From Swiss-Prot:
Domain notes: The CBM6 domain is not essential for agarolytic activity and may facilitate the reaction by binding to substrates. The thermostability of MtAgaA is likely attributed to a combination of multiple factors including the relatively high numbers of hydrogen bonds and salt bridges, the relatively short length of the surface loops, and the increased number of proline and arginine residues.
Reaction(s) the record says it catalyses: Hydrolysis of (1->4)-beta-D-galactosidic linkages in agarose, giving the tetramer as the predominant product
UniProt name for this protein: Beta-agarase AgaA
InterPro entries (alphabetical): Beta_agarase, CBM6, Cellulose-bd_IV, ConA-like_dom_sf, Galactose-bd-like_sf, GH16
Native organism: Microbulbifer thermotolerans
Keyword annotations: Glycosidase, Hydrolase, Periplasm, Signal
GO cellular component, one term: periplasmic space
SMART domains associated with the record: CBD_IV
pH-activity note: Optimum pH is around 7.0.
EC number annotated for this UniProt entry: 3.2.1.81
Other observations noted: Recombinant agarase was produced extracellularly using B.subtilis as a host. The protein expressed in B.subtilis was detected as the catalytic domain composed of amino acid residues from 19 to 300, probably due to proteolytic cleavage.
Activity regulation behaviour: Activity is abolished by Hg(2+), Cu(2+), Pb(2+) and Zn(2+) ions, but is not affected by NaCl up to at least 1.0 M, Mg(2+), K(+) and Ca(2+). Not affected by iodoacetamide, p-chloromercuribenzoate, dithiothreitol, 2-mercaptoethanol, EDTA and sodium dodecyl sulfate. Inhibited by N-bromosuccinimide.
Protein's UniProt keywords contain Membrane: no
Length: 433
């Protein structure tokens, strides 16, 4: 059932500090904002495992599925095929080949099982294929109306393709699907060249986007800020999003494509190119995702799975077989309207504390939490959709708490709001101000 946090993914979330990831020591180039720091998101993947083309592996399927966000098999001559992606030697490989007896092209595509939402920094270390095909790392909403392209590039060394080989397409789209309308920026800055003649197929490069908010994107190449798009005039000048900008949760997609605008002009791979393993593969060393969270140098943290009593106020919810919070490792799930749990926290000093709650939920509305601390009047916070049951975000209560002396304090955390199904919980933090 989707409301159950997988034990393996919980370990990934809770244990990221216990092993060295490939990106350790590589700073996030974007600024998380005043009083904030970067927190690694569990969708991050260093691909340091094996997943064969046919059958993949449990580790792969924790985060990814083969194919697209829906049954569509790709643009133009593309046909995404599950056996044209694999993980080996510490890298994800997206490959290509001819579909027998046709002019179509088999290509690999993988899509994240859970979406992401702003604010988030998303980056890949990748090496383009040496093909006229697009090598892609991009993000798309479930209804295919909002898109962010981190990597969209064409690495071929074929004569006549030099201009594209030296550029990365750094862009986004907003769509109306019926009748179909598509906007993306067309300014010169959307095609990035570093001025050094770099061919992006020749080596691995880091390309990232900080999706700061619905109206602001920052693009980074090898740690350098190379493009910023900000404001309605460039994000959505035609109002296709109805004034909300790039606001919808989006799924991560890594794939290759034979795109119409190229194949319609005769720019499509030959059989020889498709059969050449030295050019037909797009490699991704790692992908990483970070959320900006408050700095917690003076924080006391309580894991939400470490309650000493739990229960429920109100009627049972259909499908919820657990009374109160369900302990799942250090986290909680099966949380429905009216569920509560009691905790104890040891605060190190007298004074005022900010309270941060780390939760995840795909529910579109009606989410909330209530904190009753040391028997005082309850404090409430309205929560919102984070993009999935495993996409955790930090929410800060609008009111602080104060204690007159250090020591142990009891508190109760309760789910509130109109939605029957509420949120999965990670931790609550008390930050000394």
């Amino acid at each position: 059932m989707r409301k159950i946090t997988s034990i393996l993914l919980t370990c990934v979330m809770g244990c990221t500090a216990t092993y060295a990831a490939d990106w350790d020591g590589v700073p996030v180039p974007a600024n998380p904002g005043s009083g904030k720091t970067w927190e690694l998101h569990p969708l991050s993947d260093d691909f340091n495992y094996e997943a064969p083309a046919a059958g993949k592996s449990t580790r792969f399927y924790e985060r990814w599925k083969e194919g697209f966000i829906n049954p569509w098999t790709g643009p133009g001559l593309t046909e995404w095929h599950p056996h044209y992606s694999y993980v080996s030697g510490g890298k994800l490989a997206i490959t290509s080949g001819r579909k027998p007896g046709t002019n179509q092209v088999y290509l690999g595509s993988i899509t994240s099982k859970a979406p992401l939402t702003y604010p988030v920094y998303m980056e890949a270390r990748a090496k383009l294929s040496n093909m006229v095909l697009a090598s892609d790392f991009w993000f798309l909403s479930a209804d295919s109306t909002e898109e962010i392209d981190v990597i969209e590039a064409y690495g071929s060394d074929r004569p006549g393709q030099e201009w594209y080989a030296e550029r990365l397409h750094l862009s986004h789209h907003v769509f109306i699907r019926d009748p179909f309308q598509d906007y993306q920026p067309t300014d010169a800055g959307s095609w990035y060249a570093d001025g050094k003649g770099t061919k992006w197929r020749d080596a691995f490069h880091r390309v990232g986007v900080y999706w700061r908010d619905p109206w602001h994107l920052e693009y980074y190449v090898d740690g350098k800020l190379v493009r910023t798009v900000s404001g309605q005039d460039i994000i959505d000048p035609n109002g296709f999003t109805g004034g909300t900008g790039l606001s919808k949760p989006m799924y991560a997609i890594i794939n290759m494509e034979d795109q119409n605008w190229r194949s319609d002009n005769g720019i499509t791979p030959t059989d020889a190119e498709l059969a050449d393993p030295n050019r037909n593969t797009y490699y991704v060393d790692w992908v990483r995702f970070y959320k900006p969270v408050p700095i917690n140098g003076n924080a006391t943290t309580v894991e939400l799975g470490n309650f000493h009593n739990t229960g429920k106020d109100g009627a049972n919810v259909t499908g919820d077989t657990v009374l109160g919070f369900n302990k799942n490792g250090n986290n909680i799930n099966y949380n429905t309207k009216g569920d509560w749990a009691d905790y104890t926290v040891n605060l190190p000093a007298a004074g005022e504390y900010r309270v941060d709650l780390v939760i995840a939920s795909p529910m579109s509305s009606g989410l909330g939490a209530e904190l009753t601390f040391a028997g005082n009047a309850a404090k409430t916070v309205t929560l919102s959709n984070t993009g999935g049951w495993e996409s955790y975000q930090t929410f800060t209560l609008p009111q602080t708490i104060s204690v007159s002396s250090p020591g142990n304090y009891n508190f109760r955390l309760k789910s509130t709001g109109s939605s029957n199904w509420q949120w999965n919980g990670d931790e609550i933090r008390f930050v000394k101000l």
